[in-house]
Amino acid sequence: MSVEAMVQTMIDDLTAALGDAVKHDKGNAAAGTRVRKAMQAAKTAAQDVRTKVQADKNA
């Protein structure tokens, strides 16, 4: 997968999490759990992008 595609996937996933963020702001605790899960997935995806960029640089 290209770095561009990886970043676009992250953007799409974070955009999808916006609905739960709004619900969390209105007091929905379960939505907060979903937001935290999405943020953890974004963190993992960001690390994957960093690893790929570094590997491409060193290749």
Predicted segments with their positions:
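Membrane-interface helix-loop junctions in multi-pass transporters/channels
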Residues: 4, 53-57
